[in-house]
């Protein structure tokens, strides 16, 4: 960036007040909550340092290009098919940090808004058919939107999630107004919303539903916010049109339809559902969002608050993927789940929302920032002894870099909320609150999570109000203590609630809260053999080594977000043995002088010497998060299972006449592969080959002169949303037609055997085995091919 615009031009467009508490009735402006020394303030400050290393002109380059203007700097190359998306996130991050006092972030925010105004003006001139109000950097904007407006979605569906991309700038402009009161950003935002209304006005409801089949971020949310700002019903109507019925209808009817859905496509939709419910009173939207939150946090989230694997919600049968896969929960999901949690708490305050917010903030969001260079994390694997990798400034412009830019500036947003005459203390965070409407200032002193107490002091003002202190769900019944000015308060509620103290407050009044933390275990959803160890709400992990941390700092490659070092064998990871699994938590012993560090004394197979510590402290290392935990009897059965598997493997080898590993160069060369537009990949460290729509691949295989043979194929058990239909031929003679569509619903390898007629083998030392996809169908990945004796 060449310079910042801080002239009278921008000063005239900026008003000192913000709109945060006007748009979100229970929130305090971010600038009225000051973080004091602690892990969250440290992360916030480091994030500002990281953010200021990015180049605004490079982030703005896609917007100038699509507006027909010469970019002032070269655009970032990574994820270029989604060009422009990080620019919107960055604008939000600048607004958030400007609101909490960063003058340089404010200058950058104002510069970006000035440049975006230039782009918006150019779009009117250069794209008169569709460009009025447009402020997007989506590659190929002219081809996408000129055809989209006519109801032709071919270019739209052939592009990488156009509305998802645009939503980031909708949100960025809104946030510059919400957090900083920037009127120019407000006008750009409302104009952009008018553009969306005009663009879709000619589409039928059926066309809208079809279009929403492409990932579109939280378009319904930002349009609902435009309604909240302007009170013009057209924005609320459009927000409802942007609400995907495929998700809204089953969720509102309490039907869980999430299996195999792309997780971060769904969460922003639901944030919009709840915003519409709040502003319109439509119970169907609220029912959808509460049910979604309940099943995601209650049944589909891991111990640190994250959800999804391979970016999708697994079925119950496929939850072992969390142990096997390296692409665990995605950081973006949790960013959006926290937004939803804030909205639900505003609609109906409930301590369970604050419990989840705390869990996800300290265990996931905080952990996704590298504590030294400030890089961001995409995936957090739960696979035993794997690791995470990090972005670097000005490289790796992933979606989770964008949300990461925002995350660490918002730590003060939910510490306190208010509703009528009530002040909610949702989180134990060292901070100061300026409740301007009441003339009250409150200071909270705590070292949480490294301490089990918090002290709140009224430092200015007086008045009658109810102070509601959270009784965390992780504190045992009867153990929370609250004192006002040194005198104990009678507590009539239990864990997972708020303790209300309604009185006349004055300067100098104190509230002391004690919240004893205990050790516990959390079971992996639907895989109860695996447990995580917790201390209070804090997930404990263990460092296990630093070997082969490939791509620890990600490069600019398309798939650089994967921690692609060696996957260490799961069966060689530590196993906890105890006849009382719950009692494992009682065998954690604190390490003297090291807060939240523990040793574990339970019997351990494949033991690794080390200490358990907060997961958010673990970086640049392989780690244990979930542990296989077995009783003595179950462990014996586990060993017997391994022995049986080895016996079966040896028996299979004895029956095998020939075998091919699809997707691997040498075996396919050895078997003289022939193919027409097939393709390969790797899942769970096993290569595969596949073909679709009449295309094929084949191998020349040895028969050993045998005529009593079958073909044994290896499949992966999840893939029921695809149409898997194909023919198997031997020497161009059909042996069988296979339909595997919806056949398996479990994340493990499956094997099928197909007998070959003897007359196709008689007198032959080799045969060509061919796999041909049915027209319009897909074979489905084949992971292994064997000729075996019957």
Predicted regions and their residues:
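Bacterial Sec-dependent N-terminal signal peptides
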Residues: 1-21
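Solenoidal tandem-repeat scaffolds enriched in leucines and small polar residues
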Residues: 193, 200, 206, 210-217, ...
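Extended extracellular/luminal ectodomain segments enriched in beta-structured repeat modules
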Residues: 462-466, 703-712
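Asp-box/WD-like beta-propeller blade repeats and closely related beta-sheet repeat scaffolds
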Residues: 140-160, 186-210
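Aromatic (Trp/Tyr) and acidic
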Residues: 20-103, 107, 142-179, 216-234, ...
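Beta-strand-rich ligand-recognition modules
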Residues: 488-508, 514-528, 680-706, 714-790
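Helix-terminus loop motifs that line ligand-binding clefts
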Residues: 90, 104-154, 300-308
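C-terminal beta-rich recognition modules with glycine/proline-rich loops and embedded aromatic residues
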Residues: 289, 355-363, 368-460, 494, ...
């Amino acid at each position: 960036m060449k310079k910042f615009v801080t002239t009278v031009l921008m000063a005239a467009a900026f008003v000192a007040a913000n709109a945060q508490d006007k748009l979100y009735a229970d929130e305090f402006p971010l600038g009225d909550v000051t973080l004091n020394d602690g892990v969250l303030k440290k992360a916030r400050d480091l994030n500002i340092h990281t953010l200021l290393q990015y180049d605004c002109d490079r982030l703005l380059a896609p917007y100038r290009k699509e507006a027909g203007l010469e970019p002032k700097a070269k655009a970032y190359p990574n994820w270029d098919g989604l060009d422009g998306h990080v620019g919107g996130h960055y604008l939000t991050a600048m607004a958030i940090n400007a609101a909490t006092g960063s003058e340089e972030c404010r200058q950058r925010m104002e510069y970006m808004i000035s440049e975006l105004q230039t782009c918006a003006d150019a779009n009117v001139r250069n794209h008169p058919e569709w460009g009025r109000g447009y402020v997007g950097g989506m590659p190929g904007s002219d081809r996408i939107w000129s055809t989209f407006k006519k109801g032709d979605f071919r270019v739209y569906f052939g592009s990488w999630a156009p509305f998802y991309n645009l939503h980031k700038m909708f949100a960025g402009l809104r946030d510059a107004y919400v957090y900083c009161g920037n009127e120019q950003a407000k006008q750009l935002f409302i104009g952009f919303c008018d553009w969306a209304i005009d663009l879709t006005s000619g589409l039928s409801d059926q066309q809208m539903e079809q279009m929403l089949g492409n990932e579109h971020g939280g378009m319904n949310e930002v349009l609902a916010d435009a309604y909240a700002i302007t009170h013009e019903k057209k924005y609320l109507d459009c927000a409802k049109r942007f609400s995907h019925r495929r998700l809204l209808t089953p969720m509102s009817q309490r039907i869980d339809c999430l299996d195999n859905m792309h997780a971060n496509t769904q969460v922003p939709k639901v944030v919009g559902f709840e915003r519409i419910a709040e502003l319109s009173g439509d119970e169907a939207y609220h029912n959808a969002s509460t049910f979604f939150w309940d099943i995601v946090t209650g049944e589909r989230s891991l111990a640190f608050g994250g959800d999804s694997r391979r970016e999708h919600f697994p079925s119950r049968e496929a939850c072992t993927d969390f142990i096997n896969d390296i692409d665990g929960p995605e950081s973006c999901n949790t960013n959006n789940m926290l937004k939803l949690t804030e909205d639900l708490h505003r609609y109906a305050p409930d301590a369970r929302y604050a419990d989840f917010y705390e869990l996800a903030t300290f265990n996931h969001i905080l952990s996704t920032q590298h504590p030294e260079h400030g890089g961001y994390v995409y995936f957090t694997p739960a696979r035993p002894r794997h690791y995470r990798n990090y972005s670097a400034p000005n490289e790796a412009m992933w979606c989770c870099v964008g949300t990461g830019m925002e995350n660490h500036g918002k730590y003060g947003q939910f510490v306190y909320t208010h509703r009528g005459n009530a002040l909610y203390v949702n989180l134990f965070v060292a901070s100061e609150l300026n409740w301007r409407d009441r003339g009250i200032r409150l200071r909270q002193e705590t070292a949480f999570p490294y301490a089990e107490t918090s002290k709140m002091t009224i430092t200015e003002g007086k008045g009658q109000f109810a102070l509601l202190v959270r009784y965390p769900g992780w504190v045992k019944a009867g153990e929370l203590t609250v004192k006002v000015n040194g005198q104990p308060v009678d507590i009539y509620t239990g864990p997972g609630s708020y303790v209300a103290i309604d009185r006349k407050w004055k300067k100098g009044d104190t509230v002391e809260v004690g919240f004893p933390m205990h050790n516990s275990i959390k079971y992996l959803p639907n895989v109860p053999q695996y447990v995580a160890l917790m201390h209070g709400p804090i997930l404990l992990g263990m460092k296990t080594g630093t070997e082969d941390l490939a791509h620890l700092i990600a490069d600019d490659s398309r798939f650089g977000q994967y921690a692609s070092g060696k996957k260490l064998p799961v069966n060689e990871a530590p196993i906890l043995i105890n006849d009382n699994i719950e009692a494992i938590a009682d065998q954690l012993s604190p390490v003297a002088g090291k807060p939240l560090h523990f040793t574990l004394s339970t019997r351990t197979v494949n033991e690794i010497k080390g200490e358990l510590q907060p997961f958010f402290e673990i970086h640049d290392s392989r780690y244990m998060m979930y542990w296989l935990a077995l009783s003595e009897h179950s462990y014996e059965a586990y060993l017997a299972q391994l022995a049986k598997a080895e016996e079966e493997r040896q028996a299979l080898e004895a029956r095998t006449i020939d075998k091919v590993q699809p997707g691997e160069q040498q075996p396919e060369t050895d078997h003289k592969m022939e193919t027409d537009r097939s393709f390969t990949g790797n899942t769970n460290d096993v290569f595969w080959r596949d073909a679709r729509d009449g295309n094929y691949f084949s191998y020349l295989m040895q028969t050993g002169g045998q005529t009593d043979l079958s073909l044994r194929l290896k499949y992966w058990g999840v893939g029921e949303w695809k149409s898997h239909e194909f023919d198997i031929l031997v020497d161009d003679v059909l042996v069988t037609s296979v339909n595997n569509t919806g056949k398996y619903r479990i994340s493990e390898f499956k094997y099928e055997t197909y007998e070959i007629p003897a007359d196709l083998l008689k007198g032959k030392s080799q045969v060509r085995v061919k796999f041909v996809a049915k027209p319009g169908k897909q074979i489905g990945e084949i992971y292994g091919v064997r000729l075996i004796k019957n």
